[in-house]
């Protein structure tokens, strides 16, 4: 569908889709500019863009006064990459992404997508095969065994460890006694304060089994 309007400036607008008696209005994802600068793209191509994690993946942001999520993934050999999720009925035709010419990064800002939304990338490769892939830079994933990515808001937690981080810089392990206590943190959910126990028994450090989710819950995370 296409329409040409006799206007010099692009006005604020919405699309409205009618399916029988159902009407759905939404923003146009393609009216928003790319959030990755040319300088950042050149640094990425040179292998020196050390903050790629701030742009690649899925990041809830405000763009042009509209809240949504910015998606970006590197897929240089793909013919097409689309975002599919519960916000577009998992239909790869609805949100094909922009391809950045130098790097092969595909990117798109999708208005209205919030933290908690499930998504994947639908990738069309040479030969016409279509695959769905999880986000390699994703910050959330559904509970195993699902591998579907989840949009996550990372800015909500306020760290309070500035003084401790400064003190840590002065620590030289080879000059002081070290006694390490290894444990699974889930064991301490039922047994009170771990820190109090460590101080009482004289341990200086603690080594946790993996605290992030791992695939085989019976493995204790040793293969993580």
List where the protein language model places each region.
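Aromatic-lined carbohydrate-binding/catalytic grooves of carbohydrate-active enzymes
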Residues: 198-224
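Short, acidic/polar
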Residues: 188-198
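Short proline/glycine-enriched turn/loop motifs at strand-loop junctions of beta-rich domains
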Residues: 10, 74-81, 90, 113-114
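The substrate-binding groove and active-site-proximal loops of carbohydrate-active enzymes
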Residues: 184-189, 224
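Conserved, mostly hydrophobic/aromatic
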Residues: 73, 121, 183, 198, ...
């Amino acid at each position: 569908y296409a329409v040409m309007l006799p206007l010099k400036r692009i006005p604020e607008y919405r699309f409205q889709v009618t399916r029988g008696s159902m009407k759905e209005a939404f923003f146009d994802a393609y009216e928003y500019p790319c959030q990755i600068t040319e300088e950042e793209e050149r640094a990425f191509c040179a292998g020196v863009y050390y903050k790629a994690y701030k742009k690649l993946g899925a990041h809830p942001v405000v763009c042009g006064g509209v809240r949504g999520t910015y998606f970006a993934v590197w897929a240089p050999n793909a013919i097409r990459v689309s975002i599919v999720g519960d916000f577009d009925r998992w239909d790869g035709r609805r949100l094909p992404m922009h391809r950045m010419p130098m790097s092969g990064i595909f990117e798109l800002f999708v208005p209205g997508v919030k933290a908690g939304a499930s998504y994947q990338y639908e990738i069309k490769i040479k030969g016409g095969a279509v695959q769905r892939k999880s986000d390699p830079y994703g910050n959330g994933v559904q509970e195993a065994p699902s591998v579907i990515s989840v949009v996550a808001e990372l800015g909500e937690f306020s760290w309070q460890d500035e003084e401790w981080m400064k003190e840590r810089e002065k620590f030289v392990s080879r000059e002081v006694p070290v006694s390490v206590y290894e444990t699974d943190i889930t064991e301490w959910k039922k047994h009170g304060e771990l820190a109090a126990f460590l101080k009482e028994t004289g341990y200086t450090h603690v080594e946790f089994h993996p605290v992030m989710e791992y695939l085989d819950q019976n493995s204790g995370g040793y293969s993580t």
